[in-house]
Amino acid sequence: MRPIMMDMKHAYLPFLVPLSVLALSPISAAKINVELKDANGKSVGSALMYESDGIVIQLNLHDLPLGEHAIHIHQNAVCDPPDFKSAGPHFNPDNKKHGLENPAGHHAGDMQNFVVGANGKAKAQIVNKDVNWGSDNHSIFSNGGTALVIHAKADDMKTDPAGNAGDRIACGVIKK
């Protein structure tokens, strides 16, 4: 019996089709690492961000005060210490009210709180389905970038304009 001989000019086809499917896949493999700094310019950790049905934010933080803290995406890609007011208001392309529990809708930059342990560390994953990496007005890059801001207290999820979350204690610029 003779072995089956493949025409070598077509030997690449079994590999080409799966690669073309991957190239057309809408899932982005790009990731951005945002370093967060406190009012003294000291790093307090990072946020690994990637797109997956919104933006996934994986927090790995240290040297923060114990307790529940708010984290928001703010309008400007600027983090001037000590108060980080340069980051501007919450990212809000639809001009909605503040708070995930607000019946009138919420800012695109509003997100769930996270908890810092007694050791000053926090690891958390937050998903924000109201923002993206695209080119529309919900893109976190639409204004030349945005900022990730950690607040001293928890967000109450309803009080306009910022949820009574207290001072801005850490900030990181989000840019491509």
Predicted regions and their residues:
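Bacterial N-terminal signal peptides that target proteins for export
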Residues: 5-15
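N-terminal leader/targeting pre-sequences
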Residues: 24-176
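Bacterial N-terminal signal peptides
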Residues: 14-23
